[in-house]
Amino acid sequence: MNIEEFEKIMQRDDKEEKEEDLEKIWDDKSEWFFKRTEKKQENFSDRLIFKIVKEKKLLNENSKVLDIGCGTGRHLLEFSKITSHITGTDISSRMLDYAKEKLKNVNEAKFIHGNWMKNFTKEKEFDLVFASMTPAISKIEHINRMCLISKNYCMMERFVYYRDPVREEIEKMLGRKLNKLHSNHKDYIYGLWNIVWNLGYFPEIYLDKYISETEKTMIDYMKQIICTDEEKNKIIEFLKGKEKNGKIMSKEYVIKAIILWDVNIF
């Protein structure tokens, strides 16, 4: 297979949105996304990605980090415990507002709103170029740009497996499969790894597996389900039966893939 075929594998079938449409989509999701991630019952700093950074000594106090699609700044906050020279970029200004508040005590923190491909063109500007779950990286040219602006490492994180038993119960009730979540697009990692390899680098891959208790609301579930009005009413009634004090308790079975590569062969 040639490298362009891996690019097609990496890309989803979703239609391409205009930049201004993407901004509105993520602005509208920002409050829900912030509340959902902040209330997760997990010690985020214990995630494998941060253990890799520490064990491999990828960063020091003088390192410069760029987080592409930084969202509300969860990863930046952890990186700031090692270095204060952190930059977050996102298409959503509202997401960045949450990140700015979270990182308000980090004097060197910078936040750049807009299209990262337009805003970051300087060669070897950062020690680590990082991206987690972002749709902003889907082409060979995006990966090439990451390598260009990094002087040392590039690192990406992506869900490759996700299960929620409550969603499975909804599927059983409806007698059909629900729409595939973005988090279950494991072919993305397959395409990404092969593109990086074909570009001449030597990517390492790690798997972060965990089960976490999760507390969700009816809105959390409904925002991620595509259904008819009739099905919507059935799902709402079903979820009401699961609710206790407005909360629905479940478990998430998660596997995240982490790909790390050094832009310097030696």
State each model region's role:
Residues 121-128:
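A short acidic, Gly/Pro-enriched loop at the edge of an enzyme's catalytic core
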Residues 131-133, 157:
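Residues lining the SAM
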Residues 184-200, 204-206:
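Short alpha-helix
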Residues 204-266:
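Conserved Class I S-adenosyl-L-methionine
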Residues 136-149:
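A short, conserved alpha-helix within the catalytic core of class I
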Residues 1-59, 155-177:
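Conserved class I S-adenosyl-L-methionine
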Residues 66, 72-118:
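Class I SAM-dependent methyltransferase SAM/SAH-binding core
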